[in-house]
Structures are given as C-alpha cells and as structure tokens.
Amino acid sequence: MEVVLLFLCGLLAPAVLASATEQEKEKDPFHYDYQTLRIGGLVFAVVLFSVGILLILSRRCKCSFNQKPRAPGDEEAQVENLVTANATEPQKAEN
C-alpha cells in the first residue's frame, strides 16, 4: 500500500509543479505582446502622419509666408525705443 501511495504522489508532484508554473506565467506583469504593440505603434504613427499631411494640404493653417522678414535686431530696437520714450516723457503730477 505504501508503494502505491508513493507512486501516486510521485505522479502528482509534476502535475502540481506544472500548474504552479502556469499560474506564475499568468501573473507575470512584465509579459508583453510585442507584435501587437508594434502594430499599434505603427498605426498610431500613420494616423498622425496622415493628419499632418492633411493639415498642410488643407491650407486652414493661418501661417503667412508672405510677411516681410524682420532684421535680427528689430525686436531689440523696439524695446529700447519704448524704454527711452518712457524715460523722456514728463511724468504727470498726481493730485
């Protein structure tokens, strides 16, 4: 009888260990489906690329390329003119 019990326990041990490893594989949070992730990323990239091309071709963007290009020092000159204009104006007396 003891031999039969040892034999049955010997048969059950691999089955228990196999089911335990299957449960560990299911609980593994770092198992990713890379093929689906790659396809999803490519679809997302194609959609963004298509939207960009449609925006460029639709001419709804109010980018005006006909503006006269400014000289690099124009903005600095405007700020300096405002500062000097405010400094030279007489200040009004407060009542």
Curated annotation (Swiss-Prot):
InterPro entries: FXYD_motif, Ion-transport_regulator_FXYD. Residues 59-95 are cytoplasmic. It is a single-pass type I membrane protein. GO terms for molecular function: sodium channel regulator activity. Belongs to the FXYD family. Regulatory subunit of the sodium/potassium-transporting ATPase which is composed of a catalytic alpha subunit, a non-catalytic beta subunit and an additional regulatory subunit. The regulatory subunit, a member of the FXYD protein family, modulates the enzymatic activity in a tissue- and isoform-specific way by changing affinities of the Na+/K+-ATPase toward Na(+), K(+) or ATP. This is FXYD domain-containing ion transport regulator 6. The gene is FXYD6.
